Each structure stands twice: as structure tokens, then as C-alpha cells.
């Protein structure tokens, strides 16, 4: 009988330890979502959401110096935001329970950076292919961001 009680006590201690580990993992995930993902998502929106309006303004006359200057200012500000996004992404390790989510976020960030690089190339030589590719990459990144937001809602947090 004493052995059975000792076994029950050991099982209870093990269960408590596992629960503590799960709570710590949840805490790490909540912290990462709050300190890393949420600000990154906001900054991604600040880069992606103004793009259609910026492009429309430029398309009125791409050879107009003032319009091109405004578009270049948007690209520069977006580049600075993406630098902050990269620093933020690297500031805290992605919790094990969100590795796939973190990888998807990384791919989204890379796509936005690549799009901005293509758009920057466009401003240097007015080659429409760069503009088209940059626009497509941003469209893809926007879809990826939407999927991330949907996936974020499904992440299990106790």
C-alpha cells in the first residue's frame, strides 16, 4: 500500500511538473506573440497597406520628379521599417510551439524585402518588369500575412 501511495505521489509530481512546463511554454508563446509578432504585423501593415495608393500616385506620371521622389520616400521609409522588423524578429527566439508559424513569418518578411528591392530597382531605370515583379511579390506577401493572421487566431494558448 505504501508503494502504491508513493507511486501516486510520484505520478502527481510528474503531472504537476509537466503542467508547469506547459504553462511556461504558453507564457513564452504569449510573450513572443506580444513582443515580436504583434509589432511586426503592425509594421508590415505600415509597409504594405500604403503601396496601392503610392503606386497609383506614381502611375499618373512615372517620369514626374516629384511623384518619383514621393515614391522613393515611401520605399526608404519602408526599408527602415523592415530593418526594425528584422531586429525585432531576431530579438527573441521563436518558441518551439510556434516554429512553423515563425518560419512562415520569416518567409513573409523576406518576400516584403525582396519586393522593396525590386521596386527600388524600378526607380533606378524605369524597367516595368521590376515594377511588375515588386507588385506581385507584395501581393503574395499580403496574402501570406493574411494567412499568418488567421493562423495566429488558431494558435492554442491555455
Task: Describe the role of every protein-language-model region.
Residues 97-125:
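Amphipathic protein-protein interaction modules
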Residues 60-63, 121-131:
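Charged, low-complexity interaction regions
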Residues 13-14, 94, 123:
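Residue-identity detector for threonine
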Amino acid at each position: 500500500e505504501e508503494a502504491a501511495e508513493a507511486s501516486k505521489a510520484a505520478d502527481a509530481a510528474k503531472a504537476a511538473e509537466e503542467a508547469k512546463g506547459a504553462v511556461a511554454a504558453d507564457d513564452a508563446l504569449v510573450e513572443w506573440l506580444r513582443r515580436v509578432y504583434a509589432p511586426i504585423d503592425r509594421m508590415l501593415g505600415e509597409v504594405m497597406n500604403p503601396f496601392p495608393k503610392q503606386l497609383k500616385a506614381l502611375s499618373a506620371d512615372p517620369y514626374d520628379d516629384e511623384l518619383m521622389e514621393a515614391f522613393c520616400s515611401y520605399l526608404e521609409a519602408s526599408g527602415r521599417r523592415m530593418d526594425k522588423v528584422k531586429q525585432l524578429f531576431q530579438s527573441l527566439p521563436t518558441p518551439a510551439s510556434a516554429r512553423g508559424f515563425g518560419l512562415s513569418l520569416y518567409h513573409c518578411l523576406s518576400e516584403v524585402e525582396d519586393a522593396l528591392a525590386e521596386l527600388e530597382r524600378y526607380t533606378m531605370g524605369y524597367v516595368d518588369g521590376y515594377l511588375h515583379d515588386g507588385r506581385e511579390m507584395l501581393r503574395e506577401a499580403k496574402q501570406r500575412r493574411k494567412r499568418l493572421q488567421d493562423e495566429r487566431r488558431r494558435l492554442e494558448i491555455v
